[in-house]
Structure formats: structure tokens, C-alpha cells
């Protein structure tokens, strides 16, 4: 009798109730991301009511299968380009690439692009990064301005076990 009375009290209690925000940014990956997101579900914070936004997930298949955490939003490289790169890499090396190899691939392309743009004169390396320009790499577009390189990312939504590009 005492056990069932205690359980009833738990059912009567709310956790957080109505929350005063519309989005949650979860800066984590893989199992840790799923753990944090799942714990939010037990505090009345749900992706049905609040936006769940995370960091680049590299099209993590386990998140695509985890319906209770959907919809979830995240920025990422272009999915089609990533898939093509993985295929080409596998054909050449008989193994799948890691993420660093893709960034390195675009870095070599960027150096070639800047060298070609400045007639292979790289003595003034500062000038290469001060001028405003853009470079289209394998994983997307990079903007160069004021000694900074910014990568334009796409934004994706995982919902109903599918990844959809938003922009």
C-alpha cells in the first residue's frame, strides 16, 4: 500500500512544467548528446515543443534512428558532397575517410586556389588572407576576409528518421 501511494505522488508532480524558452542548444556529440537530450525529455523539455539544436553531427545515423529526440537541427557540411567524397576516398584507399582528411583535402585546394589567384607569388602571405574572396571546396564554400576564413555551413533537420536540408 505504501509503495503504490508513493508512486501516485510521483505521477501527480510536474517536473519543470511550462518552460520560458523556445530552443535548447546542446553542444555535444554521439552518446553524450543523446544522454543530454533524453534527460531533457524527463524535465518537460521536448523537441515537439522546443527546438533542439546541436553542433555538427556529420549525419550521425544513430540520431536518425532516435525518434524521441526528433526533430533536431544542426549545421553541417554539404551532405551530398560528403557522400561523394566518402565514395571516392573508399574507391581509392579501400577504407572510409575520417573528418580530418576532408578538411585537409579542402585546405590543399585552398592553398592552390590562393597561389593561382596571386600568380604563385606567396611572398606576401598576409595579403592572401586580407583580400576578400571565396573558395568553393569539396565540403562547401569558404569566405576569406580580414585574415579570417569562414566556412558557410548548411543547416539540417532530422525528423521522422530522415535528414532534410533546410538551407
Model segments located where?
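Short, well-structured alpha-helical segments in soluble
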Residues: 9-19
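Structural motif
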Residues: 25-27
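Segments of small-molecule ligand-sensing domains
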Residues: 94-105, 112-165
Amino acid at each position: 500500500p505504501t509503495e503504490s501511494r508513493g508512486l501516485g505522488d510521483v505521477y501527480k508532480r510536474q517536473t519543470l512544467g511550462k518552460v520560458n524558452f523556445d530552443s535548447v542548444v546542446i553542444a555535444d556529440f554521439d552518446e553524450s548528446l543523446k544522454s543530454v537530450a533524453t534527460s531533457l525529455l524527463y524535465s518537460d523539455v521536448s523537441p515537439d515543443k522546443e527546438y533542439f539544436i546541436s553542433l555538427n553531427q556529420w549525419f550521425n545515423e544513430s540520431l536518425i534512428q532516435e525518434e524521441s529526440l526528433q526533430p533536431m537541427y544542426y549545421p553541417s557540411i554539404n551532405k551530398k558532397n560528403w557522400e561523394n567524397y566518402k565514395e571516392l576516398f573508399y574507391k581509392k584507399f579501400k577504407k572510409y575517410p575520417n573528418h580530418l582528411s576532408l578538411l585537409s583535402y579542402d585546405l590543399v585546394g585552398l592553398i592552390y586556389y590562393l597561389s593561382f589567384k596571386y600568380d604563385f607569388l606567396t611572398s606576401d602571405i598576409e595579403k592572401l588572407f586580407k583580400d576578400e574572396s571565396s573558395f568553393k571546396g569539396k565540403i562547401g564554400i569558404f569566405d576569406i576576409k580580414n585574415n579570417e576564413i569562414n566556412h558557410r555551413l548548411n543547416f539540417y533537420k532530422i525528423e521522422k528518421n530522415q535528414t532534410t536540408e533546410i538551407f
